[in-house]
Amino acid sequence: MKKKLIKSYAKINLSLNILGREKTNFHKIQSIVSYVKLHDKIYIEPIIKEHHIVKFKGPFSKNIKNDSISKLLKILDKKNLIKKKFKILIQKNIPQKSGLGGGSMNAGSVLSFFIKNKIVRISKNEIVNICNEIGSDVLLGMDRKNSIILNKRKIEKFNTKIGLYVVLIKPKIGCSTREIYKRSKNFSKNQIKISKNIFKIESLKSAKNDLEQPAFNLYPILRKLKTFLSDVEQVKFVRMTGSGSTIVAYFLNRKPAVNALKLARKNFKNYWSILSKTI
């Protein structure tokens, strides 16, 4: 096998509802998830070595510890599910601690590649178990179909296309997921009803992210960013993705999204920002 390129796309939470706590003290969540064209590039090739090699480069490659791909390889080796060793180079274009799931999507993308190329042969149950062992969002990285995460981590996939332009802006801070969940006291009563209509713009506009309030209390700049983007012309809705710290503004057309990006960069010069589109 020659060197291959895998594109690992960023995920966005169009909604995130906290329903309560499980007996294990983890939160019960439901979420509508989509993907944008922003992606990490993963180069992978077999090597004749004793150990795998995992390296990072790019604008967001510094200070990566306990990366998800190394965890995946360690699990596959331990279970004797992979015979060869691989060199994997990741071009990191997705910021860390951004709510965009960069690391989780990386592991899911690599596992999906191994399975499709018959490097790893495992059952659906084994896929779920391995993904959950690495992280709660890794299963979402296995493919990039729009998804609804239901209680007990059940995931429903849809072929529906959303077709929205997005402006993503992230301050220099990275949110502490643990602290934000710990401060989440208000739980949603209404559960998501599975329907293709749930991905329509009017339905998405009325959705919410229950983690916004505790995140905004911890990091007031996030509230400021959302307020700013909510006032730009032709924006349909603005929402934090995941536990932050990226705020996402959604548009039907490219031109107002471009204008919003210009305004955001003018007013928040030192923040990371980008224009993208849902897949």
Enumerate the language-model features and the residues they cover.
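Short beta-strand scaffold segments in enzyme catalytic cores
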Residues: 40-44, 137-142, 147, 247-249
